[in-house]
Amino acid sequence: MSPRERVLAALRRQRPDRIPKHFDLAPAQEEEFRRRTGSDDVSEHFNLEPRFVGISATSKPRDFSEYLRDVPDLDHHDEWGVGAISSGFHHFERMVHSLRNARTPRDIAAYPWPDVLASYRWRNLPADVRCWQQRGHPVSAAPPGACGGSLFETCWYLRGQEQLLIDLYDNPDLATALLDTVNNTLIESARRLAEAGVDILRLGDDVGSQRAMLMSPDTWRRWFKARLATVIAVAKRVKPDILVFYHSDGNIEPILPDLIEIGLDILNPVQPECMDPAQIKREYGDRLAFWGTIGTQTTMPFGDPDEVRRVVRERIETVGPEGLLLAPTHVLEPDVPWENIVAFVEAVEEYGAVAPA
């Protein structure tokens, strides 16, 4: 199988020739990778199958000075106006919520929203998708959002997490205006990504904590379910075979039936410290594929290479072979030993071959 055939078979819960794999590196790990390998291409070096595309950078940045002028130690902000203050420790930053002082829907309407739907930013996307597909790779893309989030995360990055959760109860008109503004961008972006031919539509919001959800399941259903359902429906109407991927750290098992109902195909990352991957596979494996399952709170930073190999083999046996793309459950941070990264790749290669049915 080509990498694209392998990934699409696995994520459609069919039998691949071997288990596909993926991981991302934090900036310090990218530097270590370049130092050790002399390469700039992690995916090519480690034979990681997926490829990722996105829209072009803006040529018309907005002016957020009105929203950030009271932050003297601001380092930078993204195109949505979400500011960042360096922690002085690796890539970690403190976030500045540019809509933290908003009071009414008028404040949301007056905000200088980025030009993420401008046609010039989407012009190269179809060719980028075709390029990777013609080279045999599956293509994944996410609608543009603040700091890579979709609905909940983009909104709370702008507003502040605690404040947004308060708004859902105490200022529902403002919450509705903010959620609808962001979701309308997601809807149109999902349509364009489907039209461009991407194989996998990536959505994601961390709505889970270590033991439970960040909000009650009913609150999520009231405010987020229908909006995400519209995003997914638009993409599948344009491209019925598009696969929908949803990322949330933490334990979100209470809403898995809801996500399946609105069209989810792939759950990521299935944190083993929060949800048992084998149990999730037993309960939902006839309706969901899984991307992740290798713990980055346990195995990858604190295990040794033998432990990494053992866990990889266990996941293949209990969650695979159909419906599994093996990956660490988070970007690999500086605390992950290089030897464990190599062990992960080697273990998937060693144990990941799948015999024909």
Residue ranges and their predicted role:
Residues M1, F33-R35, V42-F46, E79, ...:
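N-acyltransferase acceptor-side catalytic subdomain
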Residues M1-A26, E30-R35, H77, I108-A357:
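Active-site loop segments of alpha/beta catalytic cores
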Residues R15, F46-R51, R69-P72, Q133-G136:
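Short, solvent-exposed loop/edge-beta patches enriched in aromatic
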Residues E30-R69:
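Segments that shape or occlude catalytic/ligand-binding pockets
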Residues F64-P114, R135-P138:
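A contiguous, low-structure linker/loop signature
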